From Swiss-Prot:
Keywords: Neuropeptide, Signal
Residues of the signal peptide: 1-22
Annotated knockout phenotype: Reduced lifespan when diet is restricted, and in the presence of the oxidative stress inducer paraquat. Increased pha-4 and cup-4 expression when diet is restricted. RNAi-mediated knockdown reduces lifespan and resistance to the oxidative stress inducer paraquat. RNAi-mediated knockdown in an eat-2 mutant background rescues lifespan, but lifespan remains greater than in wild-type.
Regulation: induction: Up-regulated when diet is restricted.
GO biological processes: determination of adult lifespan; neuropeptide signaling pathway; positive regulation of egg-laying behavior; response to caloric restriction; response to paraquat
Protein origin, superkingdom: Eukaryota
Its job: May regulate lifespan in response to food availability and oxidative stress.
Organism of derivation: Caenorhabditis elegans
Keyword check for Repressor: no
Protein name: Neuropeptide-like protein 7
Length: 121
């Protein structure tokens, strides 16, 4: 009796998996050549929009960072990388000591020059 019930469960599972896999393969039609092109998912436009070139360029400065700059506690906060009014890492002294710890570091006002102590070691 238990053997018949086990066989019935196996057969029902096999039939159900065959039906669902056939439905899935029918839903995902792999014969469509548009799925294998580099423009799949992009908007198809006959006329491409002209590219707008800027009239003026803004020069940027790329600086190399030393390992001492990684001691900045701003790098460990959740607000790192967001746009805020803060001095850059190059403006901070190498041996800057912060007078507060904890959740105060997440406050952007904490990093203004009036709230820090500088050690001239």
């Amino acid at each position: 009796m238990y053997i018949k019930a086990a066989l019935l469960i196996v057969v029902l599972f096999g039939v159900a998996s065959q039906i669902t896999s056939a439905l899935y393969l029918k839903q995902a039609d792999f014969d469509d050549p548009r799925m294998f092109t580099s423009s799949f998912g992009k908007r198809s436009a006959i006329e491409s929009e002209p590219q707008a070139y800027p009239k003026s360029y803004r020069a940027i400065r790329i600086q190399r960072r030393s390992m001492d700059d990684l001691d900045d506690p701003r790098l460990m906060t959740m607000s790192f990388g967001k746009r805020m009014i803060l001095p850059s890492l190059a403006d901070l002294h190498r041996y800057t000591m912060y007078d507060k710890r904890g959740s105060d570091i997440d406050d952007p006002r904490y990093f203004l020059f009036s709230n820090r102590l500088t050690c001239r070691c």
